[in-house]
Amino acid sequence: MDYKEVLANAKKNIGPNCKVCPECNGLACGNLMPGPGSKAPGNGANDNWKAWRSIRLNMDTIFPDEPVDTGIDFLGRHLSMPLISAPVGSLKAQYNPTDDIRDFNECCAEAAEQCGIASSFGDGLDARVFPHGCETSKKHGGIAIPVINPLSMETIKANLDMANEAMPFAVSFVVDSAGLPHLKKVSPDAGSKSQEQLRELCEYAKIPMIIKGIMTARGAVKAADAGAAAIIVSNHGGRVLGGSAATAEVLPEIVDAVGNRVKIIVDGGIRSGTDIFRALAIGADAVMICRPFLISYYGGRTEGIVSYIEKLRAELKDTMYMCGARKISDIDRSMIRF
């Protein structure tokens, strides 16, 4: 399926909240919540997007003409490229009231398995979502990472029990969801967690723990000290704090602070293989992408998602080739200017 066809189909199917813009840059959706927008004043997603595009590439083609390999080893798993599809809490609340997030999670896992990347799924606003996601991950060889919101410690541990039984290659805990208005509305016990509580959860999990929602070097050090195997530099796509810095802006200081201690994933406004290259050049180990995976799902379900993944792969390989990187470990800050 051609990606242009995916976008054309998505426009017909996605519902009123997303316009399937030629550039998924957060301008049209603004602060539309419920929907794909950012927390008021509504500029967070666009700030993320602009920050990546402010980073320029240093082209250098005086290198041996050798094949480009985008594969990495990540938390004990080999991935064909450093890419994870990001979790989504609900389609009914955010996009289309007739749609089921479980089908989206299933399609993402299928596409991830086909393409050799990783997917993830949230615990959602529906109690049926998390158990289904764990079963989906198990069915697809543990490729889908469960992502757990900061509810009560009792609820978190119950979800970790399900994750431990399904044995995906990692599990993630989101610290910044405490700022999601719709989560607090349906789950009044949602809230921030202390470093001691994070340490308790990391020890409770039987698989590598990824802490999502890190936006400062100080926060990254606290997550690493708590026992996280990886962190996700994320402002929740601009959905939890108006006026937050862009993820590309804070990534360098976080890499410098903990890059030798934990794996670093970054999300927020990453839309192309060239953006993936920019993130890796700063020092990230992998990236997460959310909104375009939703668009691709509405444009062709599993086939649409596969089309988007392969588009990203082609763009990443082309950028690597033109900047002199033949494998992911070749990419460094000398290949960009920012």
Q: Predicted regions: what is each one?
A:
Residues 2-80:
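An N-cap/entry alpha-helix motif that binds or orients negatively charged groups
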Residues 44-130:
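N-terminal functional module of multi-domain proteins
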Residues 95, 121-122, 144-151, 183-189:
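Flexible, glycine/proline-enriched loop segments at strand-loop-helix junctions
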Residues 108, 133, 254, 316:
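Aromatic/hydrophobic pocket-lining residues that form π-stacking "cages" and hydrophobic walls in ligand
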Residues 129-155:
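Long, hydrophobic, well-ordered secondary-structure blocks that form the structural core
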Residues 285, 301-329:
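Internal helix-turn-beta structural module
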Residues 330-338:
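A short, charged, Gly/Pro-tolerant segment at domain boundaries
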